[in-house]
UniProtKB/Swiss-Prot annotation:
One Gene Ontology CC term in the entry: chloroplast stroma
Species annotation: Oryza sativa subsp. japonica (Rice)
Identification of the protein by name: Peptide deformylase 1B, chloroplastic
Tissue expression pattern: Mainly expressed in mature leaves and sheaths.
This protein's record includes keyword Acyltransferase: no
Length: 269
């Protein structure tokens, strides 16, 4: 689905997205995810079997810093941050203030997502380094489920792995295969601060995992195999060059010097 994901998935997922959309009912974005009428039961039914052991995504430490009011400030209209801007690698703080400003931020994120033909967006992608994501697998305003997840923690992933072509609004024009688990189980909070448990599968699980990676400072090429990474090398170099030309700064990352990420949970077959 080359057109619908801040994670923009490649052409092979277009049909999957269109077939999934009718299963999603219209839903107000402030409604807690635990009460979603269609996505949660559907995902739970698909995720009943095949979960592996707990993954290394630990709860926050007691002394972990939370986002301040300044961390959550933003000026509309929001713009998508492009690779290799260091904002995409920066630490994203947890949120403990659930107010009108947070609701406004999620509203703005949805607006950007729809305007850029996305189906998911993380806060760091619009320059706000906090643990927040929004997504709607339908990809159309007024259709499907508008989902907001705050401070998400993954506690289980399925052993079943799937390969799909992904893209990302922060990497315009770049698409490549990424391996990810088909199902995930999540602890999070909704936009009101209520604690929720979520089970996701299929497209929703993939969108979530792509966005969740952003919240950890992980970019989708970090999960590509060496041969797949080689296929997008020139595209990444072009983005690095554009960054230097537009900012007058040396690119903070260089694909030519990239050694991979050793801190990732491996999804390789």
């Amino acid at each position: 689905m080359a057109a619908r994901l801040h994670l923009r998935l490649g052409p092979r997922l277009r049909g999957f997205a269109s077939s999934f959309a009718p299963l999603l009912a219209a839903h107000p974005r402030a409604l807690p995810l635990s009460r979603m009428g269609s996505v949660a039961p559907l995902a739970a039914a698909r995720a009943r079997r095949g979960f592996g052991s707990a993954v290394a995504t630990a709860p926050p430490a007691e002394d972990e810093d939370f986002a301040t009011a300044a961390d959550l400030q933003f000026e509309p209209p929001l713009k998508v941050v492009k690779y290799p801007d260091p904002i995409l690698r920066a630490r994203n703080k947890r949120i403990n203030t659930f107010d009108d400003n947070l609701r406004s931020l999620t509203d703005e994120m949805f607006d950007v997502m729809y305007k850029t033909d996305g189906i998911g967006l993380s806060a760091p992608q619009v320059g706000v380094n906090v643990q927040l994501m929004v997504f709607n697998p339908a990809g159309v305003k007024g259709e499907g489920e508008e989902i907001v997840l705050v401070n998400p923690v993954v506690y289980k992933m399925s052993k079943r792995l799937l390969v799909y072509e992904e893209g990302c609004l922060s990497f315009p024009g770049i698409y490549a295969n990424v391996v990810r688990p088909d199902n995930v189980k999540i602890d999070a909070q909704d936009v009101t601060g209520a604690k929720i448990k979520v089970k996701l599968s299929g497209l929703s699980a993939r969108v979530f995992q792509h966005e969740f990676d952003h919240l950890q400072g992980i970019l989708f090429f970090d999960r590509m195999s060496l041969d797949v990474l080689e296929s997008v090398r020139e595209g990444l170099k072009d983005l690095e060059k554009k960054y230097e030309e537009s900012t007058g700064l040396v690119s903070p990352e260089s694909i030519e010097n990239y050694k991979g990420r050793k801190d990732l949970i491996s999804f390789s077959r």
